[in-house]
């Protein structure tokens, strides 16, 4: 099952089920990743960084997938697989739920641990 969970400057993020590992994952699809040199460098830099992250407060990369089509010449799309998180800090901050001081302190603590 695949469900769109977000989108950003570089593409769309969907949730899916990894049958081989029996877990939920997030797949970030970056269309035309190599169309622009600056964007390509940014995406490759993100991939290089993600593969080194091994911390419970930072999402690391699980896998990269080639395009679904077997069309190698036009290879422009990149698929990055990461663990699926229940939510992200952006959604929490912009939700209508009031955050207590304890919530804010806990989020700051988690961010500082990740740094």
Protein language model regions, located:
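Glycine-rich ATP phosphate-binding loop
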Residues: 12-33
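Protein kinase glycine-rich loop
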Residues: 2-9, 13
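Nucleotide phosphate-binding site architecture
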Residues: 6, 59, 90
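Conserved beta-strand core positions
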Residues: 25, 59, 78-80
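Conserved HxN/HPN-centered segment at the entrance to the catalytic loop
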Residues: 54-65
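Conserved N-lobe motifs of Hanks-type protein kinase catalytic domains
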Residues: 7-8, 22, 53-56
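Conserved alphaE helix
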Residues: 40-48, 52, 74-79, 83-115
